[in-house]
Amino acid sequence: EIAFRNLRQPKENTGFVANYIDAAFNNCIFMWDSAFMLMFGKYADRIFKFQKTFDNFYSHQHVDGFICRQIEEDTGNDVFARHDPASTGPEVMTWCEWEYYLNFGDKERLSRVFPCLVAYHQWMQEHFTWRDGTYFSSGYGCGMDNCPRLDEKYHVCYSHGHMVWVDACMQELNACNLLIKMAKELGREEFIPELQQE
C-alpha cells in the first residue's frame, strides 16, 4: 500500500523517461533507496514495472559514465557535483539489475543496461580510487552515513577522510563479479579481462 502511494510519473523537462517509485523523502530520487525498493518491487512486477525506476538514472548518465546518486524530481538536476565524495554510489544498480535478470530472464533489459553499468563502473574506478586501486567514498556515497569512522575534523556524510573505505571496495568487487557474469551471459567477453584484472 505504501509503495503504490509513492508511484510517480515523470514531470516535463526533467529528462526522466519512465514511471517510478519515489522514496517519499525530499522530492529526489536516490540510487541507494531505489535499489532496495526495487528488490521488493520485483514481486509486484506484473502490476508495475518498478525496475524502470533505474531508467531515470541511466537517462541522466553523463557522457563519461558518471551517474549522480541523487536527482531532483522537479528539475532533473543532479544534486551533487560529480567529484564530490558524496556525489555517487554505492554501486548497487549492478546487483539490483542482476537480481532482476535472475528472476525474470529479461535479456533485452540486461543488454540495454549493461553498457550503462560498465561505463558507471569505469567512472568509479577512474575517479573514486586511490593510487593503489582501493576505493574511497563518503557516508552518503556508500550508503552508511551513520557509521562513526572518520576523525572528528571530517564530516561523516560528505568527506572521504583520506581513508580506504572497505565497504566501497567490497561494493565495487561485487559489481565487477556481476559485470563479468553479465558479460558472459550477453556474449560481451571483451569486457572480462579488464574487470578480472581489477
Predicted segments with their positions:
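Short, glycine/acidic-rich beta->alpha junctions
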Residues: I29-D33, C116, V164
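A short secondary-structure junction motif
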Residues: N6, P10, H60-C68, H127, ...
